[in-house]
Amino acid sequence: MNKYTLPKQSSSALISIDVQNDFTLIGAPMEIRGTHEKVLQMLQLLTAFRAAERPIIHVIRLYLPDGSNVDACRKEMIENGMAIAAPSTTGAELVDELKPDKLIRLTPEGLLQGEFQLLGKQEWAMYKPRWDAFYQTTLESRLHCSFGNL
């Protein structure tokens, strides 16, 4: 590493991606193997960022039951009735252990409109319409404008 690639802790943000029940919990419909085993390590990172009052953004997916916002590789499953990260379901929620407060619930209406949902001090959730959290979202501008030189 050099001075241009060395991480700067004082100006860093933490981004969690798809750490939702339907992708993380053992036996979940779209379990990503090995993710559940990493929840404790993720919690340690989140705890450190919370203590340092650094920004945290949880990037999530929400799939509408009609399949209108679903990636092509999952669209047929959703159209055939499979519920994956469906708005307002337990499966769409962030894993409880990683939330700043286990009672917090995602608000899909605002998230689906591109709003960032405040979860705690310096902590938000945001919806991504496709695989890339920067595609058709305001994530990049929010990181630069809201949090300074990250």
Region locations from a protein language model:
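N-terminal start-of-chain detector that recognizes signal peptides
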Residues: K3-Y4, A28-M30, E79, E123-A125
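Structural motif
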Residues: S12-A13, P55, N149-L150
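Active-site flanking residues adjacent to catalytic metal/cofactor-binding acidic residues
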Residues: I17
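Short, glycine/acidic-enriched loop or turn micro-motifs at the edges of active sites
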Residues: N21
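Short, glycine/acidic-enriched capping/hinge loops at junctions between secondary-structure elements
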Residues: L25-A28, S68-V70
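Short glycine-enriched, charge-decorated loop/helix-capping segments at active-site entrances
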Residues: G27-T35, A83
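Active-site alpha/beta core segments
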Residues: V39-F147
